UniProtKB/Swiss-Prot annotation:
Function of the protein: Catalyzes the synthesis of activated sulfate.
EC category: transferase
GO MF annotation, one: ATP binding
Gene Ontology process terms (BP): hydrogen sulfide biosynthetic process; sulfate assimilation
Full protein name: Adenylyl-sulfate kinase
Alphabetized UniProt keyword annotations: ATP-binding, Kinase, Nucleotide-binding, Phosphoprotein, Transferase
Record gene name: cysC
EC number: 2.7.1.25
Family annotation (Pfam families): APS_kinase (PF01583)
Organism (species): Shigella flexneri
Source organism phylogeny: Bacteria, Pseudomonadati, Pseudomonadota, Gammaproteobacteria, Enterobacterales
Biological or metabolic pathway of the protein: Sulfur metabolism; hydrogen sulfide biosynthesis; sulfite from sulfate: step 2/3
Family: Belongs to the APS kinase family.
Length: 201
């Protein structure tokens, strides 16, 4: 990764993060959903965004597949590319947090080091790790994109959970049982956001 030129200086905005948060009526944070493919990350994140939208919370959902259509379309699935994928998403999420948004991200993000990298970039108190913990057998049975079948057949290499490791969070802010109903999981997340005074509605 290239270092920026010494003449590139960070520009401070006249409108502060606190002013933006006051305008939105809630704090800016990242909810980082992590888990195996098929664990329900995107489904739960989407349902939570819908619930937050109904509460007039300003949100944005960054989904793993979607960012690879544009922002990260040049990246593959090597360890180096996966790390760069997460770094870019972390930078975008951080900018959105500074805009006062509640940012939801749904990425396998299999390595603890990359998730920690984003946590440090965003800052403590503004990064909520959400572990959607679903057994591999359940994820494989769901297999919404047919990826596990391809991985088992040897047609897809470096697939997380099959021939590439997933490092489960050791101390996520919230640990969700991915076999529960989505409505139950959304309620647990809303309760967490209220308990941490991120949203008040």
């Amino acid at each position: 990764m290239a270092l920026h030129d010494e003449n590139v200086v960070w520009h401070s905005h006249p409108v502060t993060v606190q002013q933006r948060e006051l305008h939105h009526g809630h704090r800016g944070v990242v909810l980082w959903f992590t888990g195996l493919s098929g664990s329900g990350k995107s489904t739960v994140a989407g349902a939570l965004e819908e619930a937050l939208h109904k509460l007039s919370v300003s949100t944005y959902l960054l989904d793993g597949d979607n960012v690879r259509h544009g922002l990260c379309s040049d990246l593959g699935f090597s360890d180096a590319d996966r790390k760069e994928n997460i770094r870019r998403v972390g930078e975008v999420a951080n900018l959105m947090v500074e805009a006062g948004l509640v940012v939801l991200t749904a990425f396998i993000s299999p390595h603890r080091a990359e998730r920690q990298m984003v946590r440090e970039r965003v800052g403590e108190g503004r990064f909520i790790e959400v572990f959607v913990d679903t057994p591999l057998a359940i994820c494989e049975a769901r297999d919404p994109k047919g990826l596990y079948k391809k991985a088992r057949a040897g047609e897809l290499r470096n697939f997380t959970g099959i021939d590439s490791v997933y490092e489960a969070p050791e101390s996520a802010e919230i640990h969700l049982n991915g076999e529960q109903l989505v409505t139950n999981l959304v309620q647990q997340l809303l309760d967490l956001l209220r308990q941490n005074d991120i949203i008040r509605s």
